[in-house]
Design a protein with these regions (language model features):
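Catalytic cores of soluble metabolic enzymes centered on carboxylation/carboxyl-transfer
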Residues: 1-139
Length: 139
């Protein structure tokens, strides 16, 4: 439960729907459930998705399918972000290391949909508009 558009800040809230990916050689380690509240105080990890296959290509295909099936409603997640990475040419070719996200963050975000059906800066825009309204009232 992180907001990838806001430097991966935690995205606390209540899980309204939890539908983990299923299938052969797909494992989800999680402690959450529908109506679980993700607190803002510590690591906002919801689940760990593990896939197993006989080779890298099959594992990536299985990962992509599992990410497409995995649905968490009510809070922002990094599922769409991870799906974008899993579909990238570099990841599919195995040219991927721990610096990949940092080096390619802008491109990844440009190709990632928002799982809360908002534009990336909707929250920020709302805050700015509210601040302007309050400022004008004080004058």
């Amino acid at each position: 439960a992180e907001n990838v558009w806001e430097n991966f800040i935690p995205a606390p809230g209540t899980i309204e729907g939890y539908y983990p990916a299923l299938g052969p050689s797909v494992r989800v380690d999680s402690h959450v459930y529908k109506d679980y509240t993700i607190p803002p105080f510590y690591d906002s990890l919801i689940a760990k998705l593990i896939v197993k296959a006989t080779d890298y290509d099959l594992a990536v295909n299985k990962l992509e399918r599992a990410l497409e099936e995995f649905t968490i409603e009510g809070v922002r997640t990094i599922i769409p972000f991870l799906l974008t990475i899993s579909k990238s040419k570099e990841f599919r070719r195995g040219f991927f290391d721990t610096s990949y996200v940092e080096k390619n963050l802008k491109t990844i975000l440009e190709n990632t949909y928002d799982d809360m059906n908002k534009e990336p800066n909707d929250d920020l825009e709302e805050v700015i508009v509210e601040a302007i309204k309050r400022y004008k009232k004080k004058r």
